Amino acid sequence: MEKLLLFATIILCVKADEICIGYLSNNSTDKVDTIIENNVTVTSSVELLETEHTGSFCSINGKQPTSLRDCSFAGWILGNPQC
């Protein structure tokens, strides 16, 4: 009995580190680009990246923000989404 329990525990631990990635079949037309694939159909999506800007930056606690502009060294370090 103990051997059977030990064997079952080992099998469960071996299978526990697997992740299954699948797609839900639906009639959605939303397509997104993921890290590993392009044009993947999803059930719903929300655009989180701003595509427009008013041109003004707000100061926070009296400190002006740093404009990262085009992929400068500071942009890479601070995580400019355009880089």
From Swiss-Prot:
Q: Which GO terms describe its cellular component?
A: host cell plasma membrane; membrane; viral envelope; virion membrane
Disulfide feature: 71-83
Modification(s) after translation: In natural infection, inactive HA is matured into HA1 and HA2 outside the cell by one or more trypsin-like, arginine-specific endoprotease secreted by the bronchial epithelial cells. One identified protease that may be involved in this process is secreted in lungs by club cells.
Glycosylation positions? 26-27, 39
Where is it localised? Answer: Virion membrane; Host apical cell membrane
Q: Which UniProt keywords apply?
A: Clathrin- and caveolin-independent endocytosis of virus by host, Clathrin-mediated endocytosis of virus by host, Disulfide bond, Fusion of virus membrane with host endosomal membrane, Fusion of virus membrane with host membrane, Glycoprotein, Hemagglutinin, Host cell membrane, Host membrane, Host-virus interaction, Lipoprotein, Membrane, Palmitate, Signal, Transmembrane, Viral attachment to host cell, Viral envelope protein, Viral penetration into host cytoplasm, Virion, Virus endocytosis by host, Virus entry into host cell
Query: Any signal peptide, and if so, which residues?
Result: 1-16
Q: GO molecular function terms here?
A: host cell surface receptor binding
The record's listing under InterPro entries reads: Capsid_hemagglutn, Hemagglutn_HA1_a/b_dom_sf, Hemagglutn_influenz_A, Hemagglutn_influenz_A/B
Give yes or no: UniProt keyword Acetylation: no
What's an example Gene Ontology biological process for this entry? fusion of virus membrane with host plasma membrane
Question: What does the record say about its membrane topology?
Answer: Single-pass type I membrane protein
* Top-rank taxon: Viruses
Assembly, per entry: Homotrimer of disulfide-linked HA1-HA2.
Homology family: Belongs to the influenza viruses hemagglutinin family.
* Function field: Binds to sialic acid-containing receptors on the cell surface, bringing about the attachment of the virus particle to the cell. This attachment induces virion internalization of about two third of the virus particles through clathrin-dependent endocytosis and about one third through a clathrin- and caveolin-independent pathway. Plays a major role in the determination of host range restriction and virulence. Class I viral fusion protein.
Q: What else is known?
A: Major glycoprotein, comprises over 80% of the envelope proteins present in virus particle.
Protein name, please? Hemagglutinin
| Species the sequence originates in | Influenza A virus (strain A/Tern/Australia/G70C/1975 H11N9)
